[in-house]
């Protein structure tokens, strides 16, 4: 193999098997895709050690992808349950899964996840550091943090979330500009705490070239984390968030010089009117790199319903440039999600992604909706169920409330507009009073 990474291959004019697969999925010319990869506009996260991967592309002109978060914690240390969640995410065709495990020895779960998953796998190495070394956070050295990142890359993680932009300059800006919610990024808060406790620079920022060595060696995509993402609408688009984004833009160029693919992570909580501007700022400051957003969550008052607040924001964000949506479940801000929460979160996020693809004019996006429209006009209920984003729920709702007329539902009965327009255009009587049809 005469290339190191997908980006290196693209710059050399080499079409990889991963590019061929992605181009076919996206209904696009593989040479056009290769150019986008070479410029960093599209990332194809594909670790050389992830043998079960079915690759996907993330970025300009492609379908909006979704990510599912899962992983073990101290209060919910159940590997079998998390593996059930992995299978649920795979069955529901999530393009990516992030292992956010943050307690104990996580390598066993991570290896099993990567071995079984065709989805892209992302991890956050700093979550693993305390358990990996059995050390307090402040006692972990800069080199040890990098060794954990390398272990995740060696295991086969396709992208690593590293909060490199939380450097001394960003930290100083944060201190000068108080927030209602401080830092709500788990990884960002851990790095900030380590920097404060040790009076040192961010080890990943200081050792960025070594981090790039790791990414280049395994062809790992670097997902530049947003330590200063807003945790409430009052903190959005503030000095800390923008200062960090400027740093991420500079780091992106350094990574591309080393042929390391980059994804930029983004907000967070913000009101509807700020979303489009934030998407444009990221694309400008980070040179068109793919944008990966959590939500955005558009109001802070809906615990138990944040899959809805997130889907609203995600649809708008993806319409205006976001390429990758992290799912949010009804359990957000409350507890670790269960399987039912996962399903609700995945469906809400997939709806947001698809709605944005329609608005962006992604090739082939309308085919699904047009097929549903035809099935509805034909009153072909079986086909409607097959096309539903949640077939099981659609079937159950109709079964629970059956109409006397086989063509209609219990909302309208024989006053169904679709039924009656079909009949009258075919020259048939409406037969409103008879029960025989």
Curated annotation (Swiss-Prot):
Q: Could you cite one Gene Ontology molecular function of this protein?
A: carbon-carbon lyase activity
Q: Does the entry feature the keyword rRNA-binding, yes or no? A: no
Q: Which Pfam families match?
A: ThiC_Rad_SAM
Q: Which residues bind substrate?
A: 69, 98, 127, 163, 185-187, 226-229, 265, 292
Q: Which UniProt keywords apply?
A: 4Fe-4S, Iron, Iron-sulfur, Lyase, Metal-binding, S-adenosyl-L-methionine, Thiamine biosynthesis, Zinc
One BP annotation, GO? thiamine diphosphate biosynthetic process
Q: Which cofactor does it need?
A: [4Fe-4S] cluster
Enzymatic reactions:
5-amino-1-(5-phospho-beta-D-ribosyl)imidazole + S-adenosyl-L-methionine = 4-amino-2-methyl-5-(phosphooxymethyl)pyrimidine + CO + 5'-deoxyadenosine + formate + L-methionine + 3 H(+)
Positions contributing to [4Fe-4S] cluster binding: 409, 412, 416
Q: Which domain of life is it from?
A: Bacteria
Its Enzyme Commission number(s) read 4.1.99.17
The family database entries (InterPro entries) matched by this protein are listed as: ThiC (IPR037509), ThiC/Bza_core_dom (IPR038521), ThiC/BzaA/B (IPR002817)
Q: Which pathway does it serve? A: Cofactor biosynthesis; thiamine diphosphate biosynthesis
Q: What Gene3D superfamilies is this protein classified in? A: 6.10.250.620, Radical SAM ThiC family, central domain (3.20.20.540)
Q: How is the cofactor bound?
A: Binds 1 [4Fe-4S] cluster per subunit. The cluster is coordinated with 3 cysteines and an exchangeable S-adenosyl-L-methionine.
**Gene Ontology cellular component terms for the protein in this record:** cytosol
Which of this chain's residues are annotated to bind Zn(2+)? 269, 333
Among NCBIfam families, the record links this protein to:
PRK13352.1, thiC
Q: What does this protein do?
A: Catalyzes the synthesis of the hydroxymethylpyrimidine phosphate (HMP-P) moiety of thiamine from aminoimidazole ribotide (AIR) in a radical S-adenosyl-L-methionine (SAM)-dependent reaction.
Q: Which HAMAP family match?
A: ThiC
Q: Which family would the database say this protein is a member of?
A: Belongs to the ThiC family.
Q: What is this protein called?
A: Phosphomethylpyrimidine synthase
Q: Which gene encodes it?
A: thiC
């Amino acid at each position: 193999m005469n290339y190191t990474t997908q980006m290196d291959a693209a710059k050399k004019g080499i079409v990889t098997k991963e590019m061929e697969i992605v181009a076919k999925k996206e209904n696009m010319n593989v040479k056009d895709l290769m150019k986008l990869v070479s410029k960093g506009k599209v990332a194809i996260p594909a670790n050389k050690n992830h043998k079960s991967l079915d690759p996907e592309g993330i970025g300009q002109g492609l379908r909006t992808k979704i990510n599912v978060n899962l992983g073990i914690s101290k209060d919910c240390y159940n590997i079998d349950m998390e593996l059930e969640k992995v299978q649920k995410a795979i069955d529901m065709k999530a393009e990516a899964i992030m292992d956010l495990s943050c307690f104990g020895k996580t390598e066993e779960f991570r290896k099993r996840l990567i071995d079984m998953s065709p989805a892209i796998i992302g991890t956050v190495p700093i979550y693993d550091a305390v358990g990996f070394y059995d050390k307090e956070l402040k006692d972990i050295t800069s080199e040890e943090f990098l060794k954990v990142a390398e272990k995740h890359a060696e295991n086969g993680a396709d992208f690593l979330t590293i909060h490199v932009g939380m450097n001394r300059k960003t930290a100083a800006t944060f201190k000068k500009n108080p927030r209602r919610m401080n830092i709500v990024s788990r990884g960002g808060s851990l790095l900030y705490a380590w920097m404060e406790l040790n009076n040192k620079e961010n080890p990943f920022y200081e050792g960025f070239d070594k981090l790039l060595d790791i990414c280049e060696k395994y062809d790992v995509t670097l997902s530049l984390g947003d330590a200063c993402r807003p945790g409430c609408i009052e903190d959005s688009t503030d000095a800390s968030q923008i200062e960090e984004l400027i740093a991420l833009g500079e780091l992106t160029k350094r990574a591309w010089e080393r042929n390391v693919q980059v994804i930029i992570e983004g907000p967070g909580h913000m009101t509807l009117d700020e979303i489009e501007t934030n998407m444009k700022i990221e694309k400008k400051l980070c040179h068109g790199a793919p944008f990966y957003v959590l939500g955005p969550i558009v109001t802070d008052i809906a615990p138990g319903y944040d899959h809805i607040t997130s889907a609203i924001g995600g649809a708008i964000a993806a319409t205006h440039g976001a390429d990758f949506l992290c799912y949010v479940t009804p359990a957000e801000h409350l507890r670790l999600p269960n399987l039912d929460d996962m399903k609700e979160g995945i469906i809400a996020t997939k709806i947001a992604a698809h709605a944005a693809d329609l608005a962006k004019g992604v090739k082939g996006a309308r085919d699904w909706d047009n097929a549903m429209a035809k099935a509805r006009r034909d009153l072909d209920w079986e086909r409607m169920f097959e096309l539903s984003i949640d077939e099981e729920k659609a079937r159950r709702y109709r079964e629970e409330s059956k109409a006397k007329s086989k063509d209609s539902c219990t909302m309208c009965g024989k006053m169904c507009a679709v039924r009656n327009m079909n009949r009258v255009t075919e020259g048939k009587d409406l037969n409103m009073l008879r029960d025989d049809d």
